[in-house]
Amino acid sequence: MAANDVPCCETMFWVYLLVCVALVVFAGLMSGLTLGLMSLSIVELEVMIKAGEPHDRKNAEKILPLVKNQHLLLCTLLIGNALAMEALPIFVDSLLPAWGAILISVTLILAFGEIIPQAVCSRYGLSIGAKLSFLVRLIIIVFFPLSYPISKLLDLLLGKRHSTLLGRAELKSLVYMHGNEAGKGGELTHDETTIISGALDMSQKSAKDAMTPVSQIFSLDINFKLDEKTMGLIASAGHSRIPIYSVNPNVIIGFILVKNLIKVRPEDETSIRDLPIRRMPKVDLNLPLYDILNIFQTGRSHMAAVVGTKNHTNTNTPVHEKSINGSPNKDANVFLSIPALNSSETSHQSPIRYIDSISDEDEEVIGIITLEDVMEELIQEEIYDETDQYVELHKRITINMPMSGNSPETATWASELASPISPYRSSLLSPSIMISTLLRSPINSPYRHSLLLRPTLHASPPAQSPSILSPDSNNERYYYLSPSRVLRKSYEKLSRSNGS
């Protein structure tokens, strides 16, 4: 067609003008939808469907079937955009001179066919794509004979779906960016980002990263007697579970629960051999922490022995250990058979391996791992206990637990004798009373606001009522009061105060 073939203001002129406007609008829709729909990943839409806002969920449900076949959608939109852009100069050339047709067509296509539609659809691509999903389906049907063969060729060359999942490092960076500490408007707190990062890192950590070496654990020989000195060491250690070994600390055969010692009287000097020794699972040195956590979740034990090959482990612990009383062990080469190791797990086959009284020749215990160790790796922070002394294993830095207002170090004691660190206490109180003080719950500790102390573990015979330790204000010595006498004194004091 030559220039000015259609006279101005005639019917065909308006028809051609409407066609040009329609082509510009159609090209703009195709360009905007190409950017808006193709920028939405399948994973992002699935997340919106499961956890998005109600209106976003509806929009994602409409768009997801279209985006699943990405190559077909891409070919359809590009073919429609190309046809509109190629047809527009033909109709504009019928209305304007050549130079005017080039200027107007380039301006219309650039402004209204590319820049504005892509800017709007990049911002509101989800809502616009959902509202125009019916039109997109109609266009796919119209251009299906052209777009389908090209899309199948792209599927063959590039693959049907492109991976949009993030790796672990990318997820950690994404979580950190969503934290409020990053300053980008995220809602995740420091604890949330730390725990999520710890959960992602735990799959790459094994038992050797969280265990406590054998040389640093508190354990007892099975031949030890539970006298006052042993009970004092157990109380000062502050552990709820204590590993038990046979002669050599590397030959761990099980563990005992400290709460089971509440009925043990130190004057009886009960042997550890006579106590119920629980079986301890054994885990490989390179076993992932998640597998260890699954073992702990079974409820059979919250402590496991970490074993390694003797050729790859080197422990400096001597074979002949001295007992608490100072006498060396005589049966250094004898392995003990413990009848108390029987448990409910022996009645059926279990995939969990346990430490036996006789270990494998190529294996030896190199450390202990507990549920607390695994949880510390998960939250990436130390779990402080009210009795332990803390040493960071990897950096060898002593960590002091911050004192609270209720801690014994900051409390006001009724007298110098009431404090467990008093220099007068060791000379006036027997070791049994000292042990009971160490085992006393901090809730019932002898602070000034509480005069009643928790009964000792062994000071009273079974047939007698538990004694209560009370300070004498006159001579600062301790004597025993029965519960009835304490209540009677309190009642008399209350009566005098009411009478006055």
Curated annotation (Swiss-Prot):
Q: Which PROSITE patterns match?
A: CBS, CNNM
Membrane topology summary: Multi-pass membrane protein
Those parts of the protein on the Cytoplasmic side are 34-71, 117-137
Bilayer-spanning residue ranges = 13-33, 72-92, 96-116, 138-158
The reply to whether Oxidoreductase figures as a keyword in the UniProt entry is no
Compartments, record wording: Membrane
Q: Which GO terms describe its biological process?
A: magnesium ion homeostasis
Positions on the Extracellular side per record topology: 1-12, 93-95, 159-500
Sorted alphabetically, the Gene Ontology cellular component annotations on this record are:
membrane
Q: What is this protein called?
A: DUF21 domain-containing protein At5g52790
Please tell me the species this chain comes from.
Arabidopsis thaliana
Q: Which gene encodes it?
A: CBSDUF5
